[in-house]
Amino acid sequence: MACVSTCLILSPRLTQVGLSSKKPFLIRLRSPVDRYSFPRMLTERCLSTRRKFNRHGIAVVKAASLDKVSGAIKPGGLVESDKLPTDVRKRAMDAVDECGRRVTVGDVASRGGLKVTEAQTALQAIAADTDGFLEVSDEGDVLYVFPRDYRTKLAAKSLRIQIEPFLEKAKGAVDYLARVSFGTALIASIVIVYTSIIALLSSKSEDDNRQRRRGRSYDSGFNFYINPVDLLWYWDPNYYNRRRAREDEGKGMNFIESVFSFVFGDGDPNQGIEEERWQMIGQYITSRGGVVAADELAPYLDVPSSKSAMNDESYILPVLLRFDGQPELDEEGNILYCFPSLQRTASGSSRRKEYVGKWFDWVADMEKFFKEKKWQFSKTSTSERALVIGLGAVNLFGVIVLNTLLNEMSVRPGGFLTFVKNIYPLLQIYAGSFFTIPLIRWFSIKRKNNQIENRNKARLQFARALESPDIALRRKLLSARDMAQKTVIGKDRIVYSTDRDMMEQNYETDEWDRRFKELEKSD
């Protein structure tokens, strides 16, 4: 199996302690892939002489150059974190905080639900920008350690991070403006349509026109057309009182927003849930020692609903790709899945429960299965929806009547009526789409919810099977627990750190010999 080499270039302080004439300093590390192919791995350090050690296959990581650490992790002096996708950077930093700012790649991948490669790239970039440093354990594991104020340092360097809050606020303002504009357009359309209808009816008779103009100053009909927003009070006189009460409670939406909600909905209820799904899966695998059966992950994945396809474990392939997993056979021929990258952690806070029969008790601190939320047609209340539909119908009726009057008009319109005739196609599109779009959405939501319900039922079926496993499944789960390995890398196991001078670390040759002998005996 091929080895992957990683370069660590030490601090420039090392050149100040009289080591420039010495032979290259070597740290021998195994790649994440090779590390688990051999029973143990060794670390070799050479200062004035080279020490050769025995039969263990080892990949070489050279720290021969003592020029400067910035050459290794700060190429070009750029802000490396700006090259990361925003969600990857945020999830990686959240994972770093959760783990106490001392992490392995597996810690960040499992806590953040990131791909192993994404987690490694993010850690390298953030460490480069925040004066983070590396630690190497006695088994060759590389840990990333960040200062307490690393977020402040990163924000001070990155213009992108500084303007992100303003961009998010601007995006929210644009979204709210779009909602308000569409609702306001309904009121404006009603005002324009019915004002035009009145003007066209008035122009039919020169004699009645003057009388109707006088009449409009005194009767209530004119107020109805010129100010149709009064319909809000006619339909629901307590609307604004209820709206104010809901706003005080921190919930609900105003009428203008409810128009947009009725037509276009309120967005995907499962937005961001994929990230949560991968976080659940990563933390589950880590808590089980990095070895699981496919049946254990089925409650969190998109599994087949048919019983004939339940034996097909291809649904676990996305997990293997994301977390660098590989299938292994136990002594009984069961296929189990091992995730070496998630077996090494710098945090010993997560506890692992032994399997005692009840899977639901065993995962009491986690979600039992991944449940997707169903789509809602609209979050508006029944009364708000009725008001929106009523005003939409009033607008549609007015547009139809206006079309008839415009076609029957014998004289050439002028002024306001010319403007209305020019924008009439837009009024038609608005009035028609006001009901066409919700109708299409209703059928689409019904189909999506049926699919979501089927997926949730399939996951629940696997979860119930784990709650009361048969003998074969029980033996498979116990075998996975026997194969599980979890190594907590404490500070007592650190043999090298890039934040200290080499002479300060001053490991004696006898100490190294003792450690290697212990490793050989354990083999």
UniProtKB/Swiss-Prot annotation:
Q: Does the keyword Chloroplast apply?
A: yes
Q: What kind of membrane protein is this, topologically?
A: Multi-pass membrane protein
Task: Look up the domain of life of the source.
Answer: Eukaryota
Please tell me where this protein is predominantly located. plastid
Q: Does the keyword Transmembrane apply?
A: yes
Keywords of the record, alphabetical order, are: Chloroplast, Membrane, Plastid, Transit peptide, Transmembrane, Transmembrane helix
| Compartments reported by the entry | Plastid, Chloroplast membrane
The stretch annotated as transit peptide is 1-63
Report the transmembrane regions from the record: 180-200, 386-406, 423-443
Q: Gene Ontology cellular component?
A: chloroplast envelope; chloroplast membrane; plastid
InterPro entries xref list: At5g03900-like
* UniProt name for this protein: Uncharacterized protein At5g03900, chloroplastic
What is the protein's species of origin?
Arabidopsis thaliana
